[in-house]
Amino acid sequence: MKCAVIYDSQTGNTRRAAEWIAEGMREAGAECGVFRIEAVDEAFVREAKGVVIGSPSYAALMTADMRAWLLSSGGKLGMGGKLGGAFATEQYTHGGGELVIQSILTNELVWGMLCYSGGAACGRPVIHIGPIGVNGNVEPHNDLENYRDYFTVYGRRFAAKAAELFGER
C-alpha cells in the first residue's frame, strides 16, 4: 500500500518532520513517497491510499506557497476517498501549528478525504489532530529532535489505519 507525505519547508525543519512521518509509515509496512510541493510525483499520489500534508507555521498560518499549492494542485490529484492527515512545524511554542493543521484538514475535507486523528484512542503519546514540532532556533529549550517520536508514531498509526480501511498492507 502506498502513502505519500507532501510538504513545504522554509528552513528544513518541516522536511525533517516529513521524513520522520515516512519512517513511521514504512515501519508499518507502507511504501512511502516524500515530496516537496514543487516536486510532487502525481502518479504516486494518485495511487496512494493515504496522504499527509505539512507546512511550517508562518505568522500563525501555513506558508503562502502551501496555500497556493493546495488551491491549484492538491485537488487535482484524485484525493477524494483517500485517508488524509496533517502536520506542522513552528518556531515558537503556540506559534500557530494547530491553525496550520486545521487549515490543511479543511482542504482535505473539501476534497472528500477521510481525515485521520488517532486522538486519545491510540494511547500515549496522544496526538489529537496531527503532530507539531517546535524548532530550537528561537527557543533554545525546544529542539525539533525532541518531537521526533510524535512524528514517527503518527506515521506508523496513520499507515496502520490506512491499511485497516483499505484492506492492504
Task: Tell me the role of every PLM-derived stretch.
Residues R26, L71, G75, L109, ...:
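Generic secondary-structure signature for well-ordered alpha-helical cores
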Residues G118-R169:
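Glycine-rich phosphate/pyrophosphate-binding loop and the adjoining helix
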